[in-house]
């Protein structure tokens, strides 16, 4: 087995381990990189790709691997009297230089995605690098500044200090707050405090309104004041026996904790998803939304949020359930719509005629109610806990929806523009979901997790001189037909009749953007959803063939004729959505795989699929 193959094998084993940290394996990785220093570019590239694809709990371990290797390269270069100012590629100094190039990107990635408890450990790495003179002082100062800002924004709030804000002190000057009251930091985060969660359940359960006469006619189980045990409410939450006892003893006065009082929460936490009208929800739904946002703000995982909500509100129905567990509140599909819960995350059955994806039904056959208020359901929060945009817009034409793009088109991308540098430039405005560069066409596509971050980035980075080029940032189209988009604002108004089955599936099941599990309702505005490559043809791909092609009837669209310039169509064959709307070659065919890339609707064949991006150089 070659050194690089063994190296990658150890990284794979770390990825599937519990913490991603093993002293013996990190030592083995370091020894392999030192023994094969002539291949340092491949080793550092493997570390880079592993760190990008690693789970959030393993980001710290990836930095430990980088630290061990880069300092070993540094020591080797010093012993051989190699120059750090003019490094040679196949040498220790060359390996140190390549590792230094990816450090900023990997540390920034860990700051954004790793648990807040890991941030102090990353700060200690900076101290180690300073003592060993591993990196220049200005580089370390920049990393420290980012770390301290992140630690200040995620400082945990003490339940005890929140109960007496007038006596709270903050010697370090970076405590958290609830509403307008300052609170001192504590060593125990709220998300791991089972007693606090139980008190929140009790407070909201006792604040629930008395059901009306119409509601009393339906037999429902009594609403408990507090969950019977921590394990019953949150099965995966680690709880010490003493904590559970304290939770039972403290449940007698649940309202003594002002952290979870509904009257205080809206001062700093939205009372519902963006754009939702508070007057259209009843008291119980308002309490559910408030509690859900409180738990999400404390980084409680979505699965545990559902468990807590069910314990606090016996009549609570989760806004979205996995396939096989419950039903998504979708309108009754017609025979041509063929949208079922069991197929939301799997390949759909082929059309009975030719195996080509079914066309969406015409407006007259849609079983979507004309007036379905958002209050009928709460959109599922995004994986990072933020509420989704799901708002009614009276300016939207009938039987249409408005989609806010999160995709930016980047022009002027020469080979001097490297992915980590470009990513760090945009990460000043918010988290970058994915980034694809195509140096052959001198452009790229970048998707932000949130629309507001994309708006800031588009304005600030519209024309930015960089090296031998000028980076131009404009709005791109990541979802829906091109002709429906206003490229000056990044907003599309899409008639529902133009949405294909694949479009509808992505709108409902996307982790970011979309409806969050709610039905597709005319007149709503939402953010661009993530898509899955290879799960059916999209309206965007159809629009590339022209408006007339997108408007054809279902029977003609599902005909047996092959695409223009394409291979013959075989029964049951799946068609990929190929090309970007800015690509000069629309006949580019993606690789014959079914990769999942939630960041972009169209994957360029020159780049790997998924979140993993190549390092700033290509190993020879």
Curated annotation (Swiss-Prot):
Residues 361-374 have a biased composition (Low complexity). GO terms for molecular function: chromatin-protein adaptor activity; lncRNA binding; molecular condensate scaffold activity; RNA binding; RNA polymerase II C-terminal domain binding; snoRNA binding. Keywords: Nucleus, Phosphoprotein, RNA-binding. Residues 151-191, 327-398, 558-620 are annotated as: Disordered. The modification Phosphoserine is found at residue 343. One of its GO terms (cellular component) is Mei2 nuclear dot complex. It is found in: Nucleus. This is Rpb7-binding protein seb1. The gene is seb1.
């Amino acid at each position: 087995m070659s050194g690089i193959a063994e190296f990658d094998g150890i990284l794979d084993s770390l990825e599937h381990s519990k913490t991603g940290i093993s002293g013996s394996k990190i030592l083995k990785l370091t020894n392999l990189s030192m023994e094969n220093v002539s291949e340092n570019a491949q080793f550092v590239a493997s570390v880079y790709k592993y760190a990008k694809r690693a789970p959030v709990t393993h980001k710290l371990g990836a930095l430990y691997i980088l630290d061990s290797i880069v300092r070993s390269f540094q020591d080797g270069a010093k012993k051989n009297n190699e120059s750090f100012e003019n490094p040679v590629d196949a040498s220790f100094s060359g390996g140190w230089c390549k590792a230094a190039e990816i450090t900023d990107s990997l540390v920034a990635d860990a700051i954004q995605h790793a648990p807040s408890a890991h941030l102090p450990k990353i700060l200690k790495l900076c101290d180690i690098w300073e003592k060993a003179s591993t990196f220049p002082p200005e580089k370390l100062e920049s990393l420290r500044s980012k770390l301290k800002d992140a630690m200040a924004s995620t400082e945990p709030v003490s339940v005890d200090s929140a109960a007496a804000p007038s006596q709270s002190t903050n010697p370090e000057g970076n405590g958290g707050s609830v509403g307008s009251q300052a609170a001192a930091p504590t060593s125990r985060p709220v998300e791991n405090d089972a007693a606090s969660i139980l008190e929140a359940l009790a407070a909201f359960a006792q604040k629930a309104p008395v059901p009306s006469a119409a509601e009393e006619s339906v037999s429902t189980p009594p609403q408990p004041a507090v969950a019977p045990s921590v394990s019953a409410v949150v099965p995966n939450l680690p709880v010490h026996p003493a904590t559970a006892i304290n939770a039972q003893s403290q449940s007698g006065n649940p309202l003594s904790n002002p952290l979870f009082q509904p009257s205080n929460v809206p001062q700093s936490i939205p009372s519902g998803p963006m754009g939702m009208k508070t007057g259209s929800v009843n008291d119980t739904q308002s309490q559910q939304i408030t509690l859900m946002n409180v738990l999400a703000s404390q980084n409680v995982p979505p699965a545990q949020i559902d468990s807590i909500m069910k314990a606090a509100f016996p009549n609570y129905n989760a806004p979205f359930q996995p396939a096989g567990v419950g039903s998504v509140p979708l309108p009754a599909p017609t025979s041509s719509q063929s949208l079922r819960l069991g197929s939301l995350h799997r390949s759909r059955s082929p059309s009975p005629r030719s195996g080509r994806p079914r066309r969406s039904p015409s407006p007259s056959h849609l079983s979507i109610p004309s007036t379905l208020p958002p209050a009928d359901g709460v959109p599922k929060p995004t994986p990072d806990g933020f509420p989704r945009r799901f708002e009614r817009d009276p300016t939207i034409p009938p039987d249409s929806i408005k989609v806010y793009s999160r995709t930016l088109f980047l022009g002027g991308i020469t080979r001097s523009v490297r992915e980590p540098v470009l990513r760090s430039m945009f990460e000043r405005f918010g988290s970058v979901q994915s980034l694809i560069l195509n140096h052959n066409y001198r452009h790229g596509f970048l998707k932000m997790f949130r629309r507001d971050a994309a708006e800031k980035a588009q304005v600030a980075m519209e024309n930015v001189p960089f090296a031998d080029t000028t980076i131009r940032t404009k709005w791109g189209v990541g979802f829906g037909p091109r002709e429906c988009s206003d490229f000056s604002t990044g907003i599309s108004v899409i008639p529902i009749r133009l949405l294909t089955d694949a479009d509808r599936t992505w709108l409902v099941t996307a982790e970011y953007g979309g409806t969050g599990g709610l039905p597709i309702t005319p007149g709503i505005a939402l953010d661009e959803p993530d898509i899955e490559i290879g799960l059916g043809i999209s309206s965007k791909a159809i629009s590339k063939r022209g408006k007339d092609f997108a408007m054809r009837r279902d029977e003609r669209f599902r005909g047996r004729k092959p695409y223009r310039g394409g291979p013959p169509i075989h029964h049951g064959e799946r068609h990929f959505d190929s090309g970007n709307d800015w690509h000069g070659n629309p006949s580019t065919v993606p690789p014959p795989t079914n990769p999942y890339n939630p960041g972009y609707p169209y994957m360029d064949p020159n780049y790997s699929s998924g979140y993993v991006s190549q390092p700033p150089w290509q190993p020879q």
